[in-house]
Amino acid sequence: MRGVPTDIGVIHFVGIGGIGMSGIAEVMHNLGYQVQGSDLAEGPSVERLRGRGIQVMIGHAPENIENAAVVVTSTAVKRTNPEVASALENRIPVVRRAEMLAELMRLKSTVAVAGTHGKTTTTSMIAALLDCGDIDPTVINGGIIEQYGSNARLGDSEWMVVEADESDGSFLRLDGTIAVVTNIDPEHLDHYGDFDGVKRAFLDFIHNVPFYGAAILCIDHPEVQAVIGQVRDRRVMTYGFSLQADICGVNIRPEGGGNVFDVIVRQRGEEDRRIADVHLPMPGRHNVQNALAAIAVSIEMGCSDEVIQRGFESFGGVRRRFTKVGEVGGATIIDDYGHHPVEIAAVLGAAQEAVSSSDKGGRVIAVAQPHRYTRLRDLMDDFQSCFNDADAVYVTPVYEAGEDPIDGIDAEALVAGLKSRGHRHAATIADPQALARTLAGEIEEGDVVVCLGAGDITKWAAGLADAIAQERGA
């Protein structure tokens, strides 16, 4: 028997509306499993799952799992959750999300995409190229792929592309045939203890690749480059802007709000070749780097140079990754998930690139919502220096994500640090209404307002253009 039998009975997902859980639930439903779930509140994911024919109950209660054969949870769900507690009491198997994803992966050959940043976009780009190459993969992603209107879909081929979440170490359960590592930065230190623990986990992830697979690694990132020499018994393909890369991006030029670039391909036993004029409809060098990872995977899987040239042309991106959500008075409102200093710096760099290439000119205005007190504490120095490409910075209150406040770690401390490091325009902002009032008197045609964070800042961004217009009309 290979994988979970489809006649196992009802599989119940606790927190089914979460971005990680919903994708697995949707794919399992499409494979013929009996799937249901519960969540604390209504939302777009819940609505989408119901539209697919999946029963979703609002609220967590023991009676929700009376007919369940298996209960699936994420590490964020505590054992005291009433559904989990009832399952344990009644000896119903309780499995972690990553364990269920690993079972799904046993059904397919898999591309597993890991990294501190960029994995959601990279996963989506890989899916786009494989689609273009008629490989038709199953996809489970950590963000909504605009082309699908979902973060998951069931394909017809033997291949699956998954985002491997390193936040709690559970990605070590995911043994990819092809493993991609985009970068390794200090993150999730509450789980790993220190940065050395993070690095060890990524090395273990790479070593999980089977002997017939490959590790695809970003040579531009110093910590990833340092890992290459430690991988002695698995095949490695590197990508990046470094001239030492096997898949090397060169001749990069911003064009039409995106990028055009060439790719030099170096494969053992073959002459170097150049794939010219790859069009990527996304700004920022970091997105070109993500695209190079996708190109490396597609080359490893035998896609043609023509597929690589045209595969990104219809790529619609990923929701909350530099997503335009509004326009007011000629200024653009962008919503982005970036919440780590490296991500923030990359997104603001892309925004400056877009402004600089525009005929209108303009400024970049960052609205940042710190996510978790522990992250802000652990990376405060980095946060204080990642906003250099923003002409103005407004910092909202910290999004707690279930954490208790930490004395001296808040929006005021971040703003004070920005000012002490020479930032000319940094201030706190209390709420969406205050933000709209402030920006109504400040933004001009050509400006780009970038709302950044993994919390509810996305709601601020969604209503910001209308709120500014109302303030100006008042």
Curated annotation (Swiss-Prot):
InterPro entries, alphabetized: Mur-like_cat_sf, Mur_ligase_C, Mur_ligase_C_dom_sf, Mur_ligase_cen, Mur_ligase_N, MurCDEF_pg_biosynth, UDP-N-AcMur_Ala_ligase_MurC
Binding residue positions for ATP: G115, T116, H117, G118, K119, T120, T121
Catalyzed reaction equations: UDP-N-acetyl-alpha-D-muramate + L-alanine + ATP = UDP-N-acetyl-alpha-D-muramoyl-L-alanine + ADP + phosphate + H(+)
Gene Ontology molecular function terms on file: ATP binding; UDP-N-acetylmuramate-L-alanine ligase activity
Pathway: Cell wall biogenesis; peptidoglycan biosynthesis
Enzyme class per UniProt: ligase
Name listed for the protein in its UniProt record: UDP-N-acetylmuramate--L-alanine ligase
Localization in the cell: Cytoplasm
One Gene Ontology CC term in the entry: cytoplasm
GO biological process: cell division; cell wall organization; peptidoglycan biosynthetic process; regulation of cell shape
A Pfam family that the UniProt record links to this protein: Mur_ligase
Gene it is expressed from: murC
The enzyme's E.C. designation: 6.3.2.8
Role according to the record: Cell wall formation.
Keywords for the protein's UniProt record, in alphabetical order: ATP-binding, Cell cycle, Cell division, Cell shape, Cell wall biogenesis/degradation, Cytoplasm, Ligase, Nucleotide-binding, Peptidoglycan synthesis
Protein origin, superkingdom: Bacteria
NCBIfam families for the chain: murC
Family: Belongs to the MurCDEF family.
